[in-house]
């Protein structure tokens, strides 16, 4: 629904009503910003949490009302003009205007771009079939749930967090699940080999057929336009009733890049979330930044933590209280009765230390680079996650032998 406020000019206009955009609006009001704020989302829904889409909402354990970021009347009560169904077609940074897909022109004093991304889909025949879905938005999951009664054989393409979380939900529903991963292990882009092997074993024990180094050549479709089989590059054909695609996102940055913003895989920002365009910020999944926990590499992070922390940095700059983005990254994933909590970034690690016994389904993996603790993957081990975060923030160099001793808390591990 469109807001009743017909204002076509805002002191701050926020494009994208996910975690990042919504939190930016909240932070501005919490910081006593008195100007006008527009919050434009392209979905026909109020701002909501994204992580439950592949977990509790997909499983039917949480209704939509319980994953709203705030009650629907929250925005209007705080003078935030929320508008749904608003998709941006172009931006004019000199005139400080943007044009929506319905040809409306909206002016802004400052622009916060928090548009996130769209699901990366397979570029193969049949990928657009009516029973092949991504898991990115509420409507994606609503369609999946509508079709589940007629779907027993589920093929999931992508062995990252989204794919594995969906696999766990589908197995709990009693579905026959196959996961296809192009690389030689699951979670290859986000975790070390030991964690990958652990999760492969857990899913296989639950009855999931995990196929590594497997890619889809095409989807065979029937006369109704529905995919009935996934044909692999090996020639093997897997009968299917539904396909789920979880192979990452394409950042929604076209209008900004076309307007002259620096970027490619996302919009480039500085440490205060400013793009190369004046008075234009970018935050969340679509923002490429030099991350101090990635050894200075220019990266994008797709997480609630990154969205919320960047939202705060952008809001503080607008409020005249600039700060640098230097938050330690963290992530989580729930699969079956396993709670994975990750803190830091393991990219470039040269040593990995196991704390605990994976057979007991409660352990941590500590990643080091040149002796410095840079990341932890904690499975059902919340204390390690909480205490390890402080060590990673401090760029600590723990004693390796003590680090491997799970009888010692991370607070008790000596530093060298």
Annotate each language-model stretch with its function:
Residues 128-151, 223-226, 236-313:
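FAD-site-proximal beta/loop scaffold in flavoenzymes
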Residues 9, 228, 236-265, 338-416:
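C-terminal catalytic lobe of FAD-dependent flavoproteins
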Residues 34, 76-77, 82-100, 106, ...:
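A Rossmann-like FAD-binding core segment of flavoenzymes
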Residues 2-81, 169-191, 387:
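Beta1-alpha1 glycine-rich phosphate/pyrophosphate-binding loop at the start
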Residues 14-15, 106-116, 157, 238-248, ...:
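Short hydrophobic core segments
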Residues 2-3, 7-11, 30, 286-383:
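Mid-to-C-terminal Rossmann-like scaffold of FAD/NAD(P)H-dependent oxidoreductases
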Residues 115-173:
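Glycine-rich dinucleotide-binding loop and its adjacent helix/turn
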Residues 14, 18-19, 44, 117-119, ...:
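Residue-level detector of alpha-helix initiation sites
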């Amino acid at each position: 629904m469109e807001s009743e406020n017909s204002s076509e000019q805002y002191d701050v206009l926020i494009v994208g009503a996910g975690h990042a955009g919504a939190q930016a609006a909240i932070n501005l009001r919490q910081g006593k910003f008195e100007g006008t704020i527009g919050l434009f989302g392209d979905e026909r829904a109020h701002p909501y949490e994204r992580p439950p889409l592949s977990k509790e909402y997909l499983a039917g354990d949480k209704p939509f009302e319980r994953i709203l970021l705030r009650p629907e009347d929250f925005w209007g009560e705080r003078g935030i003009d929320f508008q749904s169904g608003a998709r941006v077609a172009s931006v004019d940074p000199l005139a400080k205007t943007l044009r929506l897909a319905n040809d409306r022109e909206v002016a802004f004093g400052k622009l916060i771009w928090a548009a996130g991304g769209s699901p990366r889909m397979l570029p193969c025949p049949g990928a657009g079939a009516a029973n092949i879905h991504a898991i990115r938005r509420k409507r994606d999951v609503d369609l999946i749930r509508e079709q589940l009664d007629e779907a027993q054989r589920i093929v999931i393409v992508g062995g990252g967090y989204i794919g594995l979380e969906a696999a766990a939900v589908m197995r709990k529903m009693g579905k026959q699940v196959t996961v296809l991963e192009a690389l030689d292990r699951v979670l290859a882009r986000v975790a070390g080999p030991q964690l990958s092997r652990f999760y492969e074993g857990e899913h296989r024990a639950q009855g999931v057929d995990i196929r590594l180094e497997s890619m889809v050549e095409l989807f065979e479709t029937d006369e109704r336009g529905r995919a009935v089989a996934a044909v692999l590059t090996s020639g093997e054909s897997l009968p299917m009733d539904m396909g789920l695609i979880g192979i990452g996102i394409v950042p929604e940055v076209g209008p900004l890049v076309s307007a002259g913003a620096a970027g490619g895989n996302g919009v480039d920002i500085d440490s205060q979330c400013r793009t190369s365009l004046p008075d234009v910020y970018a935050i969340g999944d679509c923002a490429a930044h030099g991350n101090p926990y990635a050894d200075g590499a220019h990266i994008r992070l797709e997480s609630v933590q990154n969205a919320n922390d960047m939202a705060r940095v952008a809001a503080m700059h607008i409020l005249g209280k600039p700060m640098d983005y230097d938050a330690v990254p963290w992530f989580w994933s729930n699969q079956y009765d396993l709670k994975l909590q990750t803190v830091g970034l393991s990219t470039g690690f040269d040593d990995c230390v196991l704390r605990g016994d994976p057979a007991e389904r409660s352990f941590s993996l500590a990643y080091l680079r040149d002796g410095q603790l840079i990341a932890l993957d904690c499975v059902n081990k919340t204390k390690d996650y909480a205490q390890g975060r402080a060590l990673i923030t401090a760029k600590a160099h723990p004693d390796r032998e003590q680090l491997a001793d799970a009888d010692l808390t991370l607070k008790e591990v000596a530093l060298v």
